């Protein structure tokens, strides 16, 4: 089967063509290399159709993409980027003249654990302003603004880190993980607050942190990705190498004048409480709570921070986020939360030199 490189066909080639300098930089202590494979089989589907896959992105000083390749039969396959958030996306389309055949899309990348850094803000404020704005599922007025105002009123200072910590603590204390929610949740934060039901999964709980932070004047965003390896913290916060088709996870970060983008993950605190059957007061949970305000364990790969956005090329409607494969064939929309029904597997493996 002929192997092709997306790097040779896409306008984004320089983004994913790792230089010798970059490869050397990710060979040092603390870096781990992984391969992530999408194995797609849509051969049972008829009619014209399109497929979109979220891909790893280069991110800060904690994640570097080395290579993205594909093999199979995918007419017009290309690496694309949405024009607003820059989310890297694999796209393929079929005209209906023949059925799709099995396809594999592979990414090789390196990650290292991400602590809070000391970093000056960029002079260009465009990015900060973008991540203060509301979206369809993330309003920053009404009950969201009222709730944020009550929370930060109790903060001990006006510093963004202090106000963000007040919101983080409120999230940990008041939300809970609801295991019956499909996938990672929708992140409809107005509904959560108006209903008084603060249960959900990562895209609900961490979106609530982001929305409250924005309403309090703190730039913040979700980061969508998938777990690719075991955790050194709790077993439930990792995924053994192999089939990670259902290991998607959303995290969050906020912008600080002293530290740049600061990683947080209150949803994983609540996940550990539920799955480890430990109370918030347990010493291991208290330690995790402190750690996850300003730290990400990078047994996970970041895809993008796109929220309520249009795919490229456009799909029938905007998506709340792109963390799962997405496809449209004829009148059918394939739900990436059900890997077997969709026809895909995601497989991860650590690359050990």
What are these language model-derived features?
Residues 80-82, 102-178, 182-196:
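Acidic low-complexity segments
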Residues 18-46, 340-347, 352-353:
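C-terminal segment of N-terminal export signals and the immediately downstream linker at the start
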Residues 36-40, 51-53, 101-113:
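Short, hydrophobic/aromatic-enriched beta-strand segments in well-ordered soluble domains
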Residues 230, 234, 238-353:
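Active-site rim recognition segments
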Residues 43-59:
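Surface-exposed beta-strand/loop patches in extracellular or lumenal glycoproteins
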Residues 60-93:
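Solvent-exposed beta-strand/loop surfaces of large extracellular or lumenal domains
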Residues 5-24:
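N-terminal export signals
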Residues 155-162, 170-250, 257, 272-275:
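Active-site neighborhood of thiol-dependent amide/isopeptide-bond enzymes
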């Amino acid at each position: 089967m002929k192997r092709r490189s997306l790097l040779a066909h896409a306008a984004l080639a320089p983004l994913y063509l790792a230089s010798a300098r970059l490869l050397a930089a990710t060979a040092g202590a603390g870096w781990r290399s992984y391969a992530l494979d999408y194995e797609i089989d849509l051969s049972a589907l008829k009619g014209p159709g399109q497929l979109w896959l979220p891909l790893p992105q280069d991110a800060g000083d904690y994640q570097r993409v080395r290579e993205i390749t594909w093999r199979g039969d995918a007419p017009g396959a290309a690496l694309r980027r949405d024009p607003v958030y820059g989310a890297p996306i694999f796209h393929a389309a079929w005209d209906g003249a023949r059925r799709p055949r099995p396809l594999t899309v592979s990414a090789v990348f390196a990650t290292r654990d991400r602590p809070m850094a000391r970093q000056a803000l960029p002079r260009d404020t465009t990015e900060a302003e973008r991540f203060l704005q509301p979206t369809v599922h993330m309003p920053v007025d009404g009950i969201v603004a009222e709730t944020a105002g009550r929370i930060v009123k109790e903060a001990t200072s006006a510093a963004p880190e202090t106000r963000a910590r007040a919101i983080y603590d409120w999230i940990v204390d008041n939300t809970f993980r609801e295991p019956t929610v499909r996938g990672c949740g929708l992140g409809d934060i107005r509904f959560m607050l108006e209903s008084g039901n603060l249960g959900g999964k990562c895209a609900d709980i961490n979106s609530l942190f982001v929305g409250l932070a924005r309403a309090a004047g703190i730039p913040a965003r979700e980061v969508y990705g998938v777990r690719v390896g075991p955790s050194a913290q709790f077993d439930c916060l990792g995924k053994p190498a192999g089939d990670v088709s259902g290991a998607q996870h959303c995290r969050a970060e906020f912008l600080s004048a002293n530290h740049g983008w600061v990683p947080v993950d209150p949803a994983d605190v609540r996940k550990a409480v539920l799955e480890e059957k430990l109370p918030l007061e347990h010493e291991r949970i208290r330690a995790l709570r402190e750690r996850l305000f300003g730290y990400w364990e990078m047994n996970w790969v970041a895809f993008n921070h796109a929220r309520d956005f249009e795919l490229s090329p456009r799909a029938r409607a905007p998506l709340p986020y792109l963390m799962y494969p997405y496809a449209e064939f004829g009148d059918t929309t394939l739900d990436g939360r059900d890997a077997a029904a969709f026809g895909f597997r995601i497989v991860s493996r650590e690359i050990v030199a």
